[in-house]
């Protein structure tokens, strides 16, 4: 009897530990590993590293050009500068009309809701446009309850923003699809807190 209990406990502990180490995925790639490891995987998916633009933006971000869900996008990969660990990936559909931005948002929102149907959704508005946050949970969360960040693989934000470089009508818009891995985001934020 002791062996059965010990075996069951060991199996449950192994499953629990495995669940705690899972990462959110972008295009089937876990948001984990060093920036160089992640870059090698994303390049295999057809993304092209844009060195010039990467050097022009802030430290801890690399920029790629590619295609995401049938759309040309700019891909921003965020990583911790000291340990080079990836924690966030954002695809941006740039410079499109308001009508097209609304259509792209609706299409991607529906696809994400279908893929993550058992997860917690939080709808809101950003810049008078709809926005959606999906908490990709380790297990199903009751829809009435607020999500607990520790119980999630991470979160995915999708929203529309007006392009700030165009000041005259007709305005140009961008659609953002922003993936945050919970485990590595926590590590990155804890390192920042330790510096204070």
Language-model segment annotations:
Residues 4-19:
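Sec-dependent N-terminal signal peptides
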Residues 20-57, 93-196:
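Non-cytosolic coordination micro-motifs
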Residues 15, 24, 54-56, 63-68, ...:
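Residue-level signal for well-ordered alpha-helical segments
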Residues 62-108:
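Mid-chain, structured segments of secreted extracytoplasmic proteins
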């Amino acid at each position: 009897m002791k062996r059965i209990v010990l075996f069951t406990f060991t199996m449950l502990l192994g499953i629990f530990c495995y669940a705690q180490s899972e990462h959110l995925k972008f295009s089937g790639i876990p948001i984990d590993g060093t920036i160089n490891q992640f870059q090698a995987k994303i390049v295999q998916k057809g993304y092209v590293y844009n060195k010039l633009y990467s050097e022009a933006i802030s430290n801890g971000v690399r920029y790629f050009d590619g295609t995401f869900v049938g759309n040309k996008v700019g891909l921003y990969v965020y990583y911790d500068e000291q340990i080079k660990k990836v924690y966030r990936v954002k695809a941006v559909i740039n410079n499109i009309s308001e009508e097209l931005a609304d259509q792209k948002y609706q299409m991607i929102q529906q696809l994400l809701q279908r893929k993550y149907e058992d997860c917690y959704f939080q709808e809101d508005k950003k810049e008078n446009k709809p926005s959606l946050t999906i908490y990709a949970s380790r297990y199903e969360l009751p829809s009435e309850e607020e999500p607990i960040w520790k119980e999630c693989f991470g979160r995915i934000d999708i929203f529309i923003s007006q392009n700030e470089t165009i000041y005259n009508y007709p305005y140009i818009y961008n659609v953002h699809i922003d993936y945050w891995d919970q485990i590595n985001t926590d590590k990155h934020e804890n390192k920042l807190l330790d510096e204070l």
